[in-house]
Curated annotation (Swiss-Prot):
Belongs to the glycosyl hydrolase 13 family. Monomer. Keywords: Calcium, Carbohydrate metabolism, Chloride, Disulfide bond, Glycosidase, Hydrolase, Metal-binding, Pyrrolidone carboxylic acid, Secreted, Signal. SUPFAM superfamilies: (Trans)glycosidases, Glycosyl hydrolase domain. Pfam families: Alpha-amylase, Alpha-amylase_C. The record marks D312 as: Transition state stabilizer. It comes from Rattus norvegicus. Gene3D superfamilies: Glycosidases, Golgi alpha-mannosidase II. The gene is Amy2. Residues 1-15 form the signal peptide. Disulfide bonds join C43-C101, C85-C130, C156-C172, C390-C396, C462-C474. Chloride binds at R207, N310, R349. This is Pancreatic alpha-amylase. It catalyses: Endohydrolysis of (1->4)-alpha-D-glucosidic linkages in polysaccharides containing three or more (1->4)-alpha-linked D-glucose units.
Amino acid sequence: MKFVLLLSLIGFCWAQYDPHTADGRTAIVHLFEWRWADIAKECERYLAPKGFGGVQVSPPNENIIINNPSRPWWERYQPISYKICSRSGNENEFKDMVTRCNNVGVRIYVDAVINHMCGSGNSAGTHSTCGSYFNPNNREFSAVPYSAWYFNDNKCNGEINNYNDANQVRNCRLSGLLDLALDKDYVRTKVADYMNNLIDIGVAGFRLDAAKHMWPGDIKAVLDKLHNLNTKWFSQGSRPFIFQEVIDLGGEAIKGSEYFGNGRVTEFKYGAKLGTVIRKWNGEKMSYLKNWGEGWGFVPTDRALVFVDNHDNQRGHGAGGASILTFWDARMYKMAVGFMLAHPYGFTRVMSSYRRTRNFQNGKDVNDWIGPPNNNGVTKEVTINPDTTCGNDWVCEHRWRQIRNMVAFRNVVNGQPFANWWDNGSNQVAFSRGNRGFIVFNNDDWALSSTLQTGLPAGTYCDVISGDKVNGNCTGLKVNVGSDGKAHFSISNSAEDPFIAIHADSKL
């Protein structure tokens, strides 16, 4: 009995790090600004059959409507109430999505904006996505309700301007956003009520927006009020998966490690460093990736949520700077995402974006505010083209063959060790995941031609980067692995996709 009790305690303590994905699924996708109706369809027609574990959705709560500039993406990070009512859909549409996605084994993770309400400079009125009245000037949010007492103005009535002062970062206003007093039990209860409504509907967990701007103890107090996950889809006693947005590139007062007790943290160094390596900036080479992960000063693998780019830094916001790779850099981007999905470090998130017209002035994209594809503010449907790509300016990187097939690769090699590393001292590298998968990259300016130890059983394999295994045949390159586990690889430096990946399920 003691042993069982101990196990259940350990299970309880560790639950917030577990994404609760179905049957060995190892990656989630951020369907940024998608409508709930489109996500429900995508779970059924694509994400479930292709092995995706879950979806991070945009903030579902009521937000301010900003008309200057016209309906920017960032208006969704300015809450007005906790009603589920946004340009992605209403509460019934949200419930339908969660039910349909869970029913096919795809989890939903909500982007929870709980540090603040809208910006202090906005005018009073009902210009919100559900028409709720608010008055930022006197801190009135009647649909919650919050009043001035529930904000941090008595601790700090100005902006954050010194990131070496932890008190300022956590008590002052982030970009003018009214900072909630999460040390007050009333505020904690209102936030927990919102999150519990979502948990009861069936979500599996939360991204905590702006976690660095909240005290870890205040976050814990909110998490302690949360319900267990809905037993219709999750085992009894399951706790919500938590990943906290903590931008810690080093050199500031606040460290990501302060948040480990609450859940995982977003490792922003990951995409920034990987981008620098793939771009070959600052003398970086892929051969240096041999000790990728903790060896590069990242948080421990079981505390990391990793990504190549996110909705902020793909448009120059947040963290990472110019090295961040995005869909605009398609060739390098596919290599970076391929490396991430092949490497065992961290829990992985794939980005799915929308296109906009960029306009660089003095190195800054002055169009970085533009919201999702829309008709007069109504978000456009995600249409699917005959070639399985998306229309209406939705990029759908998660549907690119090279990325979708590497999500499957990660599932196949799950739990296998990082092994059989090879490099040429420059930008040609390869490694296996035990005896289940092997990947090789050529990011040099000359051809790769080498016989390498794959660690895989003998046979003919289909390269899942150049093609697919269909009815026992391969639409791309074939790789022959000998009885000694070795195979010959040739990759031109001018190849559209200068990498090859094979795995147990791609064996012909």
